[in-house]
Regions:
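Acidic, metal/ion-coordinating pockets
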Residues: 1-265
């Protein structure tokens, strides 16, 4: 089984890249399931029902979120009905939405879990404790478990991947918007990538307008960041090949589409 995961979609340009290239990626690589992180899809912060449906129409089977999940209040109008969307599992009890979703793929089920880190981020419940419980329950239904770990620091992401090695199919990081060069399959069969990168503006800073951020570094004054909409696009993703019987990963392949590395069908 092949799983395609597309990193943080940022703004309208990110959505355009998804609409343009995800169908082409699915045609080329033939993944059985496609997961897209959409937490920055609504002008850099949050998601709306319209955008959620756009991502599904473009080919997503599941949409994951992160620390900006609730930045756009529109999410409260549809999150409980969004059966293919997951917010971080380790939000406190009672927060709307769910942190795990199961997707049917032929005669198999795939569990998709969204987690948020705690180092240099808002302090949610312990992701290690929460995911332990969730994985134990998920493995009663399926050995194929994918985790989008939305976290800031590399050490926390690495620690979680080693902690779960052999228990889940993959742990792939999001949030920093910068792709890392450490894709590997750990000894017990868990695929790992510290950060898959972002999908959206290519010449901005983490997808935002450069000048605003540079000025903030120079004068240390508060500034409102804006998505770099008038820009060239990039898409960051990874393709994971998973053994359907054992749930163990066989390989993980980063995918990058940029003006410097165009897509070839």
């Amino acid at each position: 089984m092949k799983l395609l995961f597309v990193g943080d979609v940022v703004g309208s340009l990110g959505r355009e890249m998804v609409a343009q290239y995800v169908p082409k990626l699915k045609k080329k690589y033939k993944p059985q399931i496609t997961v897209i992180n959409g937490e920055n899809a609504a002008h850099g912060k949050g998601i709306t029902e319209k955008i959620y449906k756009e991502l599904l129409q473009a080919g997503a089977d599941v949409v994951t979120l992160g620390n900006h999940a609730f930045d756009n209040k529109a999410i409260f109008d549809f999150i409980e009905d969004a059966t293919k969307m997951v917010r971080p599992l380790n939000y406190p009890t009672g927060v709307p939405g769910k942190g795990i979703v199961y997707v049917k793929c032929n005669d198999k089920e795939v569990a998709v879990i969204n987690l948020q880190g705690r180092v240099f981020m808002n302090t949610l419940d312990d992701p290690f404790a929460k995911v332990t419980e969730a994985v134990e329950e998920a493995r009663k239904r399926t050995p194929i478990i994918f985790i989008d770990f939305h976290a800031e620091v590399t050490s926390e992401k690495q620690a979680l991947s080693w902690y779960l090695d052999g228990k889940v199919s993959a742990v792939v990081g999001t949030h920093t918007h910068v792709p890392t060069n450490d894709a590997r399959v750990l000894p017990q069969g868990t695929a790992f990538l510290c950060d898959v990168g972002m999908t959206g503006p290519y010449n901005g800073i983490l997808g935002m307008e450069r000048d605003i951020i540079i000025t903030k570094f120079l004068n240390q004054l508060p500034a409102r960041f804006e998505v770099a909409e008038d820009d060239e696009g990039q898409l960051s993703a990874c393709l994971i090949d998973i053994d359907e019987k054992t749930g163990k990963a066989k390989s993980i392949q980063p995918i990058r589409i940029t003006p410097d590395a165009p897509f070839f069908e």
